[in-house]
């Protein structure tokens, strides 16, 4: 058994696709119209086998969960990077709002930013 796909709820699929591709650097894999929404997935660098779906957050329970996680400063996902300081500088230069600057946390150094679509995302670099 392996993980092939996971989802993030987003408040605007077009804005999310731009952010995850143009700012974070992921690659669009699928963008298929499905009724009033779209099936959008992106992949990370060198990881065509693992997809992140940018799901429309139209479910009231999903919205409540997303808002509660954001309000409590809890990241909804974590992405590993090779050089967290370089990524912090690069993303800050692109206007990304960090809620936590890089800091050591045991076996990793981590930082947290807003994805502009209702989620907090953690970046981490193994120490």
Where do the model's predicted regions map?
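Conserved active-site tyrosine of GNAT-family acetyltransferases
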Residues: 16-21, 91, 118
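Vicinal oxygen chelate
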Residues: 1-5, 27-80, 86-114, 124-127
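Short Gly/charged-rich anion-binding patches and loops
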Residues: 15-16, 86
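Conserved beta-strand-loop-alpha-helix junction that forms the acyl-donor binding cleft
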Residues: 10-13
